Amino acid sequence: MATFKDACYQYKKLNKLNNAVLKLGANDVWRPSTLTKRKGWCLDCCQHTDLTYCQGCLIYHVCEWCSQYNRCFLDDDPHLLRMRTFRNEITKSDLENLINMYNTLFPINKKIVHKFANTIKQHKCRNEYSTQWYNHFLMPITLQSLSIELDGDIYYIFGYYDDMHKINQTPFSFTNLISKYDMLLLDSINFDRMAFLPLTLQQEYALRYFSKSRFITERRKCIEILHFSDNILDNLHNPNFTLQVIRNCSNMSVEWNKACNIIRNISDYFDILKSSHTEFYNISPRCRMFTQYKLKIASKLIKPNYVASNHNSLATEVHNCKWCSINNNSIVWNDFRIKNVYNDIFNFIRALVKSNLYVGHCSSEEKIYESIKEVLNVCKENEWNMLVTEMFNQLEPIKLNENNYILLNYEINWNVMNVLINSIGKIPKILTLSDVILILRIIIYDWFDIRFMRNTPMTTFTVNKLKQLYEKDRTAEHDSRISDIE
């Protein structure tokens, strides 16, 4: 069993404060929740198990038992998970406050050890101290944490996480912050606690302490789309789809890294608890991560032969053509924005191909097809620029005065005309590489302006940021027919 979970269960009986702070879903009556096969550590009870997604941020980091309380490390409520969460720069003073909170909630002294020894109903001889029955005493105070980076903000969720060698399918990575504190001082604190334990438990306590305080920090992971709820991927292609999140809120008004100090004044803590409530937010899924996911799916459906064709139809509306007809049954086309981008991109590229290469039918095989297959994946800027440069060079540009030029003398649709006029000021007859890159970008940015998108969705905002955006009516897209440029 998880040491942290056991400690919360036993120490919850100690006093009124502990009963309020150490309440875990994993130690209460189980309520069913959606399970997945993702393995990792539940941030709430610190046990390694199958995880479900959090209702507050939609990331997989909570177990099926703890999910009933809907706690998130981004909440604005003084529950234990939030008080164990630190952000960005952490000072020695902050770590001192964390250690003091641990000592307050999980004390070890002669009186406490005697009290638990008298109340624990073990099945062996009373004089034997089995780790099975005294697991809660074997949770040392360490600076072990799971960390995650969300658009420049780094969050550290401290706790006692067993079995660090086990599989981790979450975006969190183990971080050891003992270097920001005093190693010898932390040793002294734990040795003082350990001295009150029976000799048979001291050895196990020491082994656990050194294994969790001397480990090497892992390389920080990059958060990916697979770390979010599967429900998002099922609905992402609906342009009217919004993400629904639940956040725990209160009138707690302290600096982020000072939340663990609240329990110093018990009356103030319970006053804050009285103001606890939940807030619901509908949030737009617009972000670079989800946009890239949709554009990648569309890229797999590309029919590059269209750029050599003579079809009068738009690229997504060609039927009964072996080389140009796309799979219209794909869910990605439910998003009209993807269709608009696809049609305009291929209308423009076809005009370039027809203006510069001698091709007459979509059945012809051209080298330029390979360069076109990833033209929608603009999120990877360097790779995309190289791809467009390769495509430009395959259009057999003419070199004049150190610059390369290609022609544009083939018909284009009204949307592309507007892009040319807005970007260059006219409909040009010759184009440079920079012109082509600019035009292709604007066609995509018209609906998916990744320049101003966060990498992750707004579900990873703190409550304060969500409130600010909600007041400005900026958490959701109300009119899906309005483009990013508009």
Swiss-Prot record:
Residues 42-79 are annotated as: Zinc-binding domain. GO terms for cellular component: host cell cytoplasm; host cytoskeleton. Keywords: Host cytoplasm, Host cytoskeleton, Host-virus interaction, Inhibition of host innate immune response by virus, Inhibition of host IRF3 by virus, Inhibition of host IRF7 by virus, Inhibition of host RLR pathway by virus, Interferon antiviral system evasion, Metal-binding, RNA-binding, Viral immunoevasion. A motif (pLxIS motif) lies at residues 480-483. InterPro entries: Rotavirus_NSP1. It is found in: Host cytoplasm, Host cytoskeleton. It comes from the Viruses. Coiled coil: none annotated. The keyword Calcium does not apply. GO terms for biological process: symbiont-mediated suppression of host cytoplasmic pattern recognition receptor signaling pathway via inhibition of IRF3 activity; symbiont-mediated suppression of host cytoplasmic pattern recognition receptor signaling pathway via inhibition of IRF7 activity. GO terms for molecular function: metal ion binding; RNA binding. Residues 82-176 are annotated as: Important for cytoskeleton localization. The keyword Aminoacyl-tRNA synthetase does not apply. Residues 317-486 are annotated as: Interaction with host IRF3. It holds the Pfam family Rota_NS53. Residues 1-81 are annotated as: RNA-binding. The integrity of the zinc-binding domain in NSP1 is important for degradation of host IRF3. The pLxIS motif targets host IRF3 for degradation; however phosphorylation of NSP1 pLxIS motif is not required for its activity. Belongs to the rotavirus NSP1 family. Interacts (via C-terminus) with host IRF3; this interaction leads to IRF3 degradation. Interacts with host IRF7; this interaction leads to IRF7 degradation. Interacts with host CUL1 and CUL3. Plays a role in the inhibition of host innate immunity by inducing the degradation of key host factors required to activate interferon production such as IRF3, IRF5 or IRF7. Associates with components of cullin RING ligases (CRLs) including CUL1 or CUL3, which are essential multisubunit ubiquitination complexes, to modulate their activities. This is Non-structural protein 1. It comes from Rotavirus A (strain RVA/Human/United States/DS-1/1976/G2P1B[4]) (RV-A).
